[in-house]
Amino acid sequence: MKKIILLFSTLFLMLSPAISNAAGFALGVTVSDNTLDTAGKEDVDSNGSIDAKKNVSDDFNVGSIFAEFTNMGDRFGITVGLEIIPFDADIDKRSITQSELGDENDTASTGTNSVEGTVKDHMTFYIQPGYMVGSNTMLYGTLGFASATVNGKSKSITHTNINKDVDLDGTKVGVGIKHVYDSGLFIKADYAETSYDTISFTTSNSTKATADLDNTSLALSLGKQF
């Protein structure tokens, strides 16, 4: 994925001197409606067998800021940009009651397991090749690399508690439409899917928890060309 983005970035730089009517630098803000799907698994003794599974979805809205640079040819253009979410996004806390069977020396116990998380420092580097369908309107595709930090917290009667930060990387693909006004103001609307790498947490008593996250978003952006 990183090699693909590097290839597009190199192409972008090679085209820069050759295109005389480059659209230029832009700043903007984005509001997006998101659905984050999380598939969680738990391996109590890290032996490769899955002891528990849970799939959940969280719907949320989030704001972000972006900076980008666009080069335009006659009909084709390419944009390179960076989007930053300056806020933390919480994954809703989930709880479930669990009973632990006792042995000949211990009595059975019942308790509540819970898991929650926070996504922070989220940023996306993206490439958007596009095609003009009018004098001021472009259809474009998005290819991006996303990175963030996830703080995972878990409490369980079968393992020691978790409170740990892990790195989260993902690949973003999408499509959108952009309209630029004569004043330099522009609006963008796009749909995107981000598939994140699987992350894992291991407790001190060898319980391994893994989570696979996928995000779907509908976004509306407002920006200004300079």
Residue positions per predicted region:
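Cleavable N-terminal export/targeting peptides
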Residues: M1-A26
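Gram-negative outer-membrane beta-barrel domains
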Residues: S20-F226
